[in-house]
Amino acid sequence: MTKEKVFKKKSSILEWGKAIVIAVILALLIRNFLFEPYVVEGKSMDPTLVDSERLFVNKTVKYTGNFKRGDIIILNGKEKSTHYVKRLIGLPGDTVEMKNDHLFINGNEVKEPYLSYNKENAKKVGINLTGDFGPIKVPKDKYFVMGDNRQESMDSRNGLGLFTKDDIQGTEEFVFFPFSNMRKAK
């Protein structure tokens, strides 16, 4: 093999190596700062999100703080490997209260249309979907969350407590698996 062919072969290998390194760096940047896939574990968000569904999470809101009441958010648990998928209910400074299956934020009733299926099922068996609680004043720099499956969810009401902005990993963007059920959860 001539020196020219050896040089071209090494040059070609270097070009492929550069392309692979750039692709890996881009993938890491996208995953760490823009979007990341998550797997729903458990029943706390049924039927909005069901166990084993896979969703993409928009991580940009973690840096912009651009999340709002009603968003489905992914939270870090106390252990690094634990994540929770919950609905953002109370923002810093809010007063959260549940009376007779109606949510009140700062004294104003907040409609929760995403709970209609679960509320109908609870009424069929003669119970409220969500037990009364509060009023709870959400401290500065804290967030109050609940699962949509209020009977099955561990959340800010009953064990998980309140979360900080740093605990929020992002908002649910869309469900991508199973493919037959791709959608934007509401």
From Swiss-Prot:
The active site is at 44, 86. Its EC number is 3.4.21.89. GO terms for molecular function: serine-type endopeptidase activity. Keywords: Cell membrane, Hydrolase, Membrane, Plasmid, Protease, Transmembrane, Transmembrane helix. It is an enzyme of class 3 (hydrolase). SUPFAM superfamilies: LexA/Signal peptidase. It is found in: Cell membrane. The chain crosses the membrane at residues 16-35. Residues 36-186 are extracellular. GO terms for cellular component: plasma membrane. Pfam families: Peptidase_S26. It is a single-pass type II membrane protein. This is Signal peptidase I P. The gene is sipP.
